[in-house]
């Protein structure tokens, strides 16, 4: 909480809720969420806390409306819930452009990238991490993903149904990338979690549909 003259203004708490499974939510995050008066987040993040009888606001494409809502509720305890960790491709950067650092508190969470590398039993300090969410995916494949895969021993991609692993693998193969392994973590930490390992050449033939996944591309 910060003080402005005689007013006391609550900090906006930006909280990483982890990959989605409740067992992967940090206790410090759980405590902050329970103490909050208002929860703000995407549908998937808010659904984790349906049992909490609190005011909830969904983050949609109109981000300026969310910023206005936060400004209107500066005197309340507001928790902004983001998937994974706030420091990795989240709503945090947008908030920092519209609010001062002193108005924001960040509570970390486990990223699905961390979970994917744990499932693969690999370290990831040398990995290149790229998000395809909300990007021009075809352009990203050509200009960012392909060079990274060619140059780096480990690449992690955050992707979804619009750019499934099969399509990524087919594109890379067409660019002459072949001697790589793809590991696909789908719905990580949820009961329906799947983790698939295949050569890049095998992936386009996979019949599974992947909904919300992390793709690791490593040397064979």
Predicted regions and their residues:
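Class I S-adenosyl-L-methionine
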Residues: 2-107, 114-115
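A contiguous loop/helix-start segment that scaffolds small-molecule binding in enzyme catalytic cores
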Residues: 10-14, 78, 149-220
């Amino acid at each position: 909480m910060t003080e402005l003259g005689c007013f006391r203004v609550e900090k906006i708490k930006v909280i990483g809720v982890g990959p989605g499974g409740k067992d992967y939510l940090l206790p410090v995050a759980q405590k902050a969420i329970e103490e909050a008066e208002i929860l703000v987040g995407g549908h998937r993040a808010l659904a984790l806390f349906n049992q909490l009888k609190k005011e909830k606001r969904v983050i949609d494409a109109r981000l300026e409306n969310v910023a206005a809502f936060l400004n209107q509720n500066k005197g309340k305890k507001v928790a902004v819930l983001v998937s994974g960790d706030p420091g990795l491709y989240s709503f945090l950067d947008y908030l920092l452009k519209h609010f001062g650092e002193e108005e924001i508190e960040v509570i970390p969470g486990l990223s699905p990238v961390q979970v994917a590398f744990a499932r693969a039993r690999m370290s990831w300090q040398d990995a290149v991490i790229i998000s395809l969410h909300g990007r021009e995916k075809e352009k990203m494949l050509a200009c960012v993903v392909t060079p990274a895969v060619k140059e780096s021993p480990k690449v992690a991609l955050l992707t979804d149904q619009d750019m499934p692993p099969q399509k990524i693998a087919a594109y890379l193969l067409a660019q002459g990338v072949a001697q790589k392994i793809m590991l696909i973590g789908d719905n990580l930490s949820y009961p329906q979690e799947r983790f698939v390992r295949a050569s890049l050449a095998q992936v386009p033939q996979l019949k599974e549909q992947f909904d919300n996944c992390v793709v690791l591309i490593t040397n064979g």
